[in-house]
Amino acid sequence: MADPKHQYTAAVVTVSDSCSRGEREDRSGPAVSQLLEQFKFSVVVREVVPDDQIQIQSLLIRLAREARLVVTTGGTGVAPRDVTPEATAAVCDRLLDGVAERMRSEGLKKTPFAALSRGVCGARGQALILNLPGSPAGAVESLQAVTGLLPHALDLLIGKTEHT
């Protein structure tokens, strides 16, 4: 359940073979969690999962029932085991292409490699699933690019459609 000072719940998933095996410390998940807390999200779950599409899909389905926002970090590039976008698209009812486009657009201002990110954003029921790059800086910068959109998108998903 969300802390009273927080309006929305969030789950953070680090997708990384090496982190899931304990060979590397997860730095992206904690960085993303910290930023979400600053924006008044209550991070209720943090998980680390290997780059396995079926495992990612199963986890996203479960977390979309537990949190309004599910943020993944990692597995969005072009390497053979980067399957986070495929897993996300497979479990979403609708994709929000503009959100991913905004993240890439902002990322391109810092590095040309942002063009290689295949991250997507989509809705599953009343939850939003957002893919971020695996590097701590890339994950934080991508999330910062869309934090202003998230509350409105989450409100729309529960039917709050009044416009002021």
What do the predicted segments below correspond to?
Residues 1-164:
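Non-catalytic beta/alpha edge segments that cap or flank active sites
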